[in-house]
């Protein structure tokens, strides 16, 4: 696969939340597409293992994305090693649920808010100018179809995701106003994500409607092949598996 950028130097792409199956798949696909990939996680052993799975040339980095100063140091490290970041694929999240509204716990809310909102705010504030200045700047987050019809049992989850989506749409407005208008902020929407490991551990389940992490990865690569003005502010639904 050819590089999404036709220029001599490859795109510098940061995959945040890179330790899981989706992070591995996205980093691998971007690496194969010719990007210079930095995959970020909070646990050194896990992110190094993920980078190894993603392939030669993928660089693992450790950062607590909930801490703004740590994210600023992350930018300094990447910039020193490879120059400005062109794109961030934000895969940090998490899920918590309850039975209804009364038992939505503060602990679950704090967990979801930190994972879905705080990390995204920090990463976007620190890397916004770099992405906006790139000729192929992209920012993408993954959201959920649960926002279409919010259910009481997942009130905290959908509220956190909605906040993250709103912030991303505000980024899109910022990119429109930036000089050049070459950057795009996008929300990728799935019902759920599934990978081969999850299927092997749960052979009795069919995961109807879930999107394979390889399809997510392919969708991320496609973001660099479409014009920014067509993508910016888009909420793109990814296909899931049909019921079996």
PLM feature spans:
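Conserved glycine-rich cofactor-binding loop
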Residues: 19-20
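Conserved glycine-rich Rossmann-like NAD(P)H-binding loop of the short-chain dehydrogenase/reductase
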Residues: 33-49
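Rossmann-fold cofactor-recognition segment
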Residues: 54-69
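Conserved mid-core segment of classical short-chain dehydrogenase/reductases
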Residues: 72, 93-110, 153-156
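Amphipathic alpha-helical dimer-interface segment in Rossmann-like NAD(P)H-dependent oxidoreductases
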Residues: 76, 80, 114-135, 172-173, ...
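Catalytic Tyr-X3-Lys loop
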Residues: 102-121, 140, 164
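Catalytic loop of short-chain dehydrogenase/reductase
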Residues: 132-179
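C-terminal helical subdomain
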Residues: 182-189, 195-196, 203-244
């Amino acid at each position: 696969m050819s590089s999404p950028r036709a220029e001599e130097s490859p795109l510098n792409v940061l995959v945040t939340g890179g330790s899981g199956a989706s992070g591995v798949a996205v980093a691998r696909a971007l690496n194969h597409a010719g990007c210079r990939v930095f995959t970020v996680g909070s646990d050194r052993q896990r992110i190094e293992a993920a980078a190894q799975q993603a392939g030669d040339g993928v660089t693992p980095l450790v950062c607590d994305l909930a801490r703004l100063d740590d994210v600023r140091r992350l930018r300094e490290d990447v910039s020193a090693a490879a120059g400005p970041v062109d794109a961030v694929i934000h895969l940090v999240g998490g899920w918590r649920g309850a039975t209804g509204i009364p038992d939505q716990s503060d602990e679950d809310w704090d967990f979801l808010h930190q994972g879905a909102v705080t990390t995204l705010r920090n990463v976007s504030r620190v890397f916004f100018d770099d992405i906006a200045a790139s000729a192929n700047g992209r920012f993408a987050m993954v959201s959920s179809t649960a926002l279409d019809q919010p259910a009481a049992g997942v009130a905290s989850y959908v509220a956190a995701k909605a906040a993250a989506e709103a912030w991303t749409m505000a980024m899109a407005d910022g990119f429109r106003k930036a000089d050049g208008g070459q950057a795009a902020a996008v929300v990728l929407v799935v019902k759920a994500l599934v990978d081969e490991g999850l299927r092997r551990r749960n052979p009795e389940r069919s995961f109807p409607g879930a999107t394979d992490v390889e399809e997510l990865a392919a969708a991320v690569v496609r973001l660099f092949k479409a014009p920014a003005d067509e993508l910016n502010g888009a909420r793109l639904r990814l296909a899931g598996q049909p019921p079996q």
